[in-house]
Every structure is written in structure tokens, then in C-alpha cells.
Amino acid sequence: DAQGSSSQPLTAPIFSNFTIIGAKSDGTVSLPIGEKFEKAFRLRRNTATSVFNTIVTGWEKGLSIEGTAVVANVNGDTLVFSNNSLTNFNNGANTILSSGVTPAFYQSFWTPDGNDSTETIAQINWVNLFTALGVTPDARLNAGSVAANGATFTHPKFFSVAAPGVANLTYCQGATA
């Protein structure tokens, strides 16, 4: 809710395998002051949003975790940010220190959870993502891309669905199906 209370249900979407490109694209675009493309992820108000296996580029800043409730969600593993690549931010601000958030807090989960903010656009190595206006971009990865391998789906937030099976059930004495 707008107050960030602990009321249920808690906003807790799970995003996986996204390529997210902001308006600043390859980092050469300058937008006017006051534009609304400052942060790729602004997690606030007790959200428990989780993001896995995602590549992000094209913003001034990367991940902003705002407020003690959101910090508690990270520490409690309700909010998970894992195996993501945040690349090519104009000012190098891949993580943002908000009130109550310290560099040690980010370090406690950033690298252990497989996140990377050191990769460059050249290392991501898209086929032809940043094209001239009117030319269709190609967001596939070239051979040798650092992002081509490494996705993982082992976190408990991912669930498995068992295949339906057949079982013998006794409906009444002596009869089975």
C-alpha cells in the first residue's frame, strides 16, 4: 500500500529472464533534467519484489532499496535480487544508498547472490541492440557473451509443478479405481 505498511497481501511479484533497456540506451543519450528515467529498480514501501536472471542497462542509476521495511524483506529473503547484470550506468551508480541503507548492506547480498555490475555492454555482446532510429534492434546475444550462461533457477522462490499422476483410490469397500 502507499504507506508501506505490513498489511497483507504484500506486493511480491517474481520477475525472471528479462532484458530491460531504459531510455538512456547505450549510455550516450542525454535526457533533459527532470526526466523520469533515473532508477532502473526503485524498491520501496515494504515491497517484496524479486528479480532473477535479468540484464539491465540504460538508466542513470541501478538498484535503489528504500526504507527499513524493504531492507527487512531483503534480510528475510522475502525480496530477492539474484543473478542479475546491471551494466553501463552513466554515473556508475549501480546501487543507491538511501536512508537506512549502507554499503555493507548491499555487499551482504550483491555478490553472494550472483549479481554483477562490472560487465560492460561490449561484454554483454548483443547482436545489434542499439540501432539508429527506424532500424529494428536485435537483442539476441552473440557467441561469447558473458550473459549467455549462468542463469539459475535453484532459489526456493521458483516452484516446480509435479506432473499429474494416476493413483489407486478406494471409493467404497472392495472397489478401486
PLM feature spans:
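Extracellular beta-rich repeat passengers
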Residues: 1-177
